[in-house]
């Protein structure tokens, strides 16, 4: 296993092409993960994780209108699953993240994760792929799809 490394938003360890991350409390997950990918020049990869959040905005794509409907949740929730991929769009880090979070009453909410603020812990695994994947806008779907 590699050396533990520290940053302003995260700590991590390296194991081959995989990175085990612990995000700092109160950081925004997308911002911290994007900073990590920029810092380590990860251009293509996968991410999954768990944790706890207290404010998050999720998105749902309405395929009829090709518009996202955003909803913000301002409550303590457990991340039961965070899954996504890492690529680049116009040379910038592009994260495509989906999340499911459990509420205090054990119901779950989820969708495309726009933002989520750590409140407790957030533990992620990032796998770096040796290929590169870009993104391009697809007018038919209204999505930024892989561009190989």
At which residue positions do the language-model features occur?
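N-terminal intrinsically disordered, cationic/polar leader segments
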Residues: 2-95, 100-148
